[in-house]
UniProtKB/Swiss-Prot annotation:
InterPro entries: EFG_II, EFG_III/V, EFG_V-like, EFTu-like_2, G_TR_CS, P-loop_NTPase, Ribosomal_Su5_D2-typ_SF, Ribsml_uS5_D2-typ_fold_subgr. This is Elongation factor 2. The lineage of its organism: Archaea, Methanobacteriati, Methanobacteriota, Stenosarchaea group, Halobacteria. One of its GO terms (molecular function) is GTP binding. Belongs to the TRAFAC class translation factor GTPase superfamily. Classic translation factor GTPase family. EF-G/EF-2 subfamily. It comes from Natronomonas pharaonis (strain ATCC 35678 / DSM 2160 / CIP 103997 / JCM 8858 / NBRC 14720 / NCIMB 2260 / Gabara). The modification Diphthamide is found at residue 597. It holds the Pfam family GTP_EFTU_D2.
Length: 729
């Protein structure tokens, strides 16, 4: 029997012992060494050969990942590890660190109970480290820390024990500050989740040279830091690897400090599921009952050239097996499971069944998308997975060959299914399709994959930035009349408080939650009681309030009112860009008593026009997306680096020394950051490393508004002059 077959059999045996299971993700900033570390763990578990670990990048299975040397998709793998005389099953997800692929990280966190955060010893905690930590903590996932590339401190920077200790203590302090800040507000975490060397929740080492240490491992092997420095300086890295192998240190830490599903699910279920806490389904999920109803959350959709579409996700209760007919949230009817498997590196191994507490890879769930709830009974779905950043950049994609058009449309729909952070707009009439993503690299990778994997040659347009529109002050009351003049709506618009907008973005307030809970949350964020109890609907980050009293026929017309409102908010009055952060109030309405005279053709335009006019009266402005920029650069290039930010309508917020480099931090509009990578390289002779992170939207400068609005209107084929405001006042 082959070694791999043996591992699969052992995994199958351990799947039924939830106490022995650990579901974990490895997450970090780009290039801090996650994938190299993952390869080491696979080698330690006997999944790939020890010699090639670190070069193999077994988890980077796509051609573009190996070419670019970064992880783009989150990859899954199951392996076994013996700890304290007991074998453990470790289901691991390696996630991307590049900011453009943060959606994969968010989804991975839903499937796991522990996150191993990897930080580069030389660079320290970076912007994306903070983002992945925040995503983990928000999903109720417990962190531990591995500080990688310690070999560089010893060999390159020639640091002695004191300097090293100071630097490493600094990294641990930064990470703990983030953990403390996030967990203080969490009622369901009653233990201290900060990491420390003494507890064994921090490990150090070098993924490249395959050695690692932690407090427990030093006690076990009798090695101390002084000896490690000696061996590393004397280039005896093989001896270091043999005496204190990285995979043992990290996997021991995983088994000791991360919760198993039995401990984790009772705490995590209330955080990610808002159904009836006393129901049988709730009990089965909290007890990880493999005999209960099946409940699985899909976190990832992938394509296998042989098996077709594969839905991977966490089984919270019940057991999934071939032939089951399962409900998929948000769709009618059921899907039949064709096959069930687990991941071993890039390969999927078919197994008979996967019980609660494990990560399964299933075919046959044709209606599932990343984020779907799959279950054997109809039930309240899981909370939607909140992605920290929204799409900010758009490209048009056309098939070079008209014959490829149907295949291109199908491929784009598939892309949107696999990666919910991508938005696709398909225009059947023009054949031009818009695809919006997190950044230039995100869209570049998607279009390359369409060409390479599907063999469809495409033309792509220049990148276009996504804008928003938002009211700046309270409007006067505006009347909206239906075309037949028999129906009137009286509406005002005002800006919504920033705290409330943020709460909606984070998913802490939605129309899916019980009304009382929603009202309390809104009042906590500063909304007054009367307004909070009259919320009719929430659309994106806009709230619609029904302040009317006893208006005849309004109840049966409300659905059309909401439809008109949503149309107005999806295409704002300035440039048909989405409106955000608006509080819309309906004060009064006059409706025709005969239903035939207050149908969709009358109500929808009346409301749409009233909302647009109220927005114009509320001084609506264009918002543009911005990015936080961090550039690390040698001293002599500091001026060039800050010049690159300032020359892009940006602002430099801070400059400071870190090690032998200067750090320049600032913000700049995404629109101006297109093409930044090649410019910064030439400005600093290739000596800079940099990072950008999407930081939401801000009001665009007044002097740039008219020109930008004209450009967008022209691009969309709209009339150049803005709609005139009807004079009601």
């Amino acid at each position: 029997m082959g070694r791999r077959k043996k591992i699969v059999q052992e995994c199958e045996r351990l799947m039924d012992e939830p106490e022995q299971i650990r579901n974990i993700a490895i997450a970090a900033h780009v290039d801090h060494g996650k994938t190299t570390l993952t390869d080491n763990l696979l080698a330690g578990a006997g999944m790939i050969s020890d010699e090639t670990a670190g070069e193999q990048l077994a988890m980077d299975t796509e051609e573009d990942e190996q070419e670019r040397g970064i992880t783009i998709d989150a990859a899954n793998v199951s392996m076994t590890h013996e700890y304290e005389d007991e074998n453990h099953l470790i289901n691991l997800i390696d996630t991307p660190g590049h900011v453009d692929f943060g959606g994969d990280v968010t989804r991975a966190m839903r499937a796991v109970d522990g996150a191993l955060v990897v930080v580069d010893a030389v660079e320290g905690a970076m912007p994306q480290t903070e983002t992945v930590l925040r995503q983990a903590l928000r999903e109720g996932v417990k962190p531990t820390l591995f500080i990688n590339k310690v070999d560089r401190l010893i060999s390159e920077l020639q640091e002695g024990p004191e300097e090293m200790q100071q630097r490493l203590t600094g990294v641990i302090g930064d990470v703990n500050e983030l953990i403390r800040g996030m967990t203080e507000e969490m009622d369901d975490i009653n233990e201290d989740w900060t990491v420390s060397v003494e507890d064994g929740t921090v490990g150090f080492g070098s993924a490249l040279y395959k050695w690692g240490v932690s407090m427990p491992s030093m006690q076990r092997t009798g090695m101390d830091f002084g000896e490690i420095i000696e061996l590393e300086r004397a280039d005896k890295r093989q001896e270091l690897h043999e005496r204190t192998p990285l995979s043992d240190v990290v996997l021991d830490m995983v088994c000791e400090h991360f919760p198993n599903p039995v401990d984790a699910q009772p705490r995590r279920i209330p955080r990610i599921w808002r159904g009836d806490a006393d129901s049988e389904v709730a009990e089965a999920m909290e007890l990880v009952n493999e005999d209960g109803e099946l409940v699985m959350m899909v976190t990832d959709i992938g394509i296998d050239p042989h098996a077709g579409e594969i839905a991977a996700g966490r089984v919270f209760s019940g057991t999934i097996e071939k032939g089951q007919d399962l409900y998929v949230s948000g769709t009618a009817g059921t899907n039949r499971v064709q096959s069930v498997g687990i991941y071993m590196g890039g390969e999927r191994e078919e197994v008979e069944r996967v019980p609660a507490g494990n990560i399964a890879a299933v075919t046959g769930l044709k209606d599932a998308i990343a984020g779907s709830t799959v279950s054997s009974v109809e039930m309240t779905p899981f909370e939607s997975i909140e992605h920290i950043s929204e799409p900010v950049i758009t490209k048009s994609v056309e098939a070079k060959n008209m014959d490829d058009l149907p295949k291109l449309i199908e491929t784009l729909q598939q892309v949107a299914k696999e990666d919910p952070t991508i938005q696709i707009e398909i225009n059947e009439d023009t054949g031009e399709h818009l695809i919006s993503g997190q950044g230039e690299l995100h869209l570049e990778v998607i279009t390359q994959r369409i060409e390479r994997n599907q063999g469809i040659p495409v033309n792509t347009g220049e990148p276009i930035v996504v804008f928003r529109e938002a009211p700046q002050q309270e409007s006067r009351e505006v009347e909206g009349r239906s075309p037949n003049n028999h129906n009137r709506f009286y509406i005002t618009v005002e800006p919504l408080e920033d705290d409330i907008v943020e709460t909606i973005k984070m998913g802490d307030v939605s129309m899916d939650m019980p009304e009382l809970e929603r009202r309390e949350e809104l009042m906590e964020q500063g909304m007054d009681k009367d307004t909070a109890q009259n919320v009719e609907t929430i659309h994106n980050t806009n709230v619609f309030i029904d302040d009317t009293k006893g208006i005849q026929h309004l109840n049966e017309t409300m659905e059309l009112v909401v439809e008109g409102l949503e149309e107005a908010l999806n295409d704002g009055p300035l440039a048909a860009e989405p409106v955000e952060g608006a509080l819309i109030r309906l004060h009064d309405a006059r409706l025709h008593e005969d239903a035939i005279h207050r149908g969709p053709a009358q109500v929808i335009p009346a409301v749409r026009e009233a909302v647009h006019n109220a927005l114009i009266d509320a001084e609506i402005k264009l918002l543009e997306p911005i990015q936080e920029v961090r550039i690390d650069v040698p001293n002599e290039h500091m001026g060039a680096a800050s010049g690159e930010i300032q020359g892009r309508r940006g602002r430099v917020d801070d400059m400071y020394q870190e090690g032998d480099l200067m750090v320049v931090e600032g913000v700049a509009p995404v629109d101006e950051m297109i093409g930044f990578s090649s410019d910064i390289r030439s400005a600093t002779e290739g000596r800079a490393s940099w990072n950008t992170e999407n930081a939401g939207f801000r009001v665009m400068a007044d002097n740039l508004q008219p020109e930008t609005i004209d450009e967008i209107r022209e691009r969309k084929g709209m009339k150049l002059e803005l709609p005139e405001q009807i004079d009601y006042f």
